[in-house]
Amino acid sequence: MSLIVPENYDPKLSIRETEEAIRYIRETFQDEIGKELNLQRMSAPMFVEQSTGLNDNLNGVEAPVSFTMKDLPGETIEIVHSLAKWKRFALKKYGFGLHEGLYTNMNAIRKDEDLDNFHSIYVDQWDWEKVIAKEERTEATLKATVRQVFKVIKHMEHEVWYKFPQAVYHLPDEIHFVTTQGLEDRWPELSPMEREDKIAKELGCVFVMKIGDKLQRSGEPHDGRAPDYDDWSLNGDIIFWYEPLQTKLEVSSMGIRVDERAMKEQLEKAHATDRAELPFHRDLLAGKMPYTIGGGIGQSRLCMLLLGKAHVGEVQASIWPEEMKEACAKAKIQLL
């Protein structure tokens, strides 16, 4: 557990006003992002069968919450970590065409999360996925889509200002693009997360590209990424510099998804070739899955950003250690 406590924190809104702002942001943003990216809202599972291989393995070390059910003896059911692979499967199952996509309200439990101002064991995000052509699996496509997502986030600043002018946090006017290798070359002495802090403070908002593969200097990845959804050469995180806490705030991870070649190479690099026998992976390697781009946009993180909140627990209901709750109460941080 770690906690940043800002000096003289003013939440600006009461808890009930905050709840109204959360409702407004969530309802407005999902409509706006759906229109911008041509996405249809779809119902999504909260749990999947382990045997399908559809759950997100995240960094490969976090264990999902799992259980068994009476009518499926011998099958382990897992609470989702995210819907990264399920969405691609759903696009195929429901017959989505080129440049059509879906978004879901995804709720997950990540029981092994390290808790801090931004991280909770409860995860809520808009998970989205869109069909693209194979020839569109390019950096240009990725950057254009990142700019579309940023445009909607920036527009939300104005929407929130109109309704809650006393609370809105002002965002930069543009997003910049950097690579993880470029950051390592510039600051080899810093850790990857320290590099993100540096570049976010310098530029205001950045898309940090190419996450998952080993960097040239250190021989270590910038950050962990599962090998079976993002193409590590065509992905990244949208990160804002967040003045209230004097640190970076990641709002979205997204990327162009693996094709057959990238899946095979990344499974080998991750020493996870056994996954190739799972139904999802088998279909993808056989060329039976659509080519897609997709990502997740944190709902609580976005509310926190737009309202200038000091803790994610001010915009979502979760469980926190007593020590954290006491420190927040002293600092006027109103946990729900």
From Swiss-Prot:
Enzyme class: ligase
Entry protein name: Aspartate--ammonia ligase
Annotated InterPro entries: aa-tRNA-synth_II, aa-tRNA-synth_II/BPL/LPL, AsnA
Annotated pathway: Amino-acid biosynthesis; L-asparagine biosynthesis; L-asparagine from L-aspartate (ammonia route): step 1/1
Species of origin: Limosilactobacillus fermentum (strain NBRC 3956 / LMG 18251)
Keyword ATP-binding attached: yes
Disulfide bonds: none
Gene: asnA
BP GO terms, sorted: L-asparagine biosynthetic process
Family of this protein: Belongs to the class-II aminoacyl-tRNA synthetase family. AsnA subfamily.
